[in-house]
């Protein structure tokens, strides 16, 4: 069936932020270059996020992507590491479950 799009897959498991590991949901607001992004986090803070070297080629992020970040031990209000990016189906699931209410 050429030209027809397949319906989006329902995610079977969606990784949620682990509070005991200090993980926070965020949305990419701006690409800064040099593996840096500006992230609006669910705790209301605007942080500069870094994509670590081991994930640089695995995680391709764009503006408005929903990600999981871990704030740094030092300067935790200003800087963070991006550790996970959600797909479109996973973002829909997070919306339905109420995880993305901070974006409104």
Swiss-Prot record:
**Low complexity: which segments have biased composition?**
1-14
Task: Give the record's keywords alphabetically.
Answer: Initiation factor, Protein biosynthesis
GO MF term set = RNA binding; translation initiation factor activity
Q: Which residues form the S1-like domain?
A: 12-87
Tell me which SUPFAM superfamilies the record gives.
Answer: Nucleic acid-binding proteins
SMART domains reported for this sequence: eIF1a
* Stored Pfam families: eIF-1a
Q: What CDD domains does this protein map onto?
A: S1_IF1A
In residue numbers, the region (Disordered) covers 1-20
Please indicate if the UniProt record lists RNA-binding as a keyword: no
Family per UniProt? Belongs to the eIF-1A family.
Summarizing the function annotation, the protein's role is: Seems to be required for maximal rate of protein biosynthesis. Enhances ribosome dissociation into subunits and stabilizes the binding of the initiator Met-tRNA(I) to 40 S ribosomal subunits.
The protein, known as? Translation initiation factor 1A
């Amino acid at each position: 069936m050429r030209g027809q799009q397949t319906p989006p897959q329902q995610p079977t498991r969606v990784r949620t932020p682990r509070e005991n590991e200090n993980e926070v949901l965020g949305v990419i607001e701006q690409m800064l270059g040099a593996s840096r992004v500006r992230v609006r986090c669910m705790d209301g803070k605007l942080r500069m996020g870094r994509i670590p070297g081991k994930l640089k080629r695995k995680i391709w992020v764009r503006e408005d992507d929903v990600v999981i970040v871990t704030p740094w031990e030092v300067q935790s209000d200003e800087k963070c590491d991006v550790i996970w990016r959600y797909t479109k189906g996973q973002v829909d699931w997070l919306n339905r479950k109420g995880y993305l209410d901070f974006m409104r």
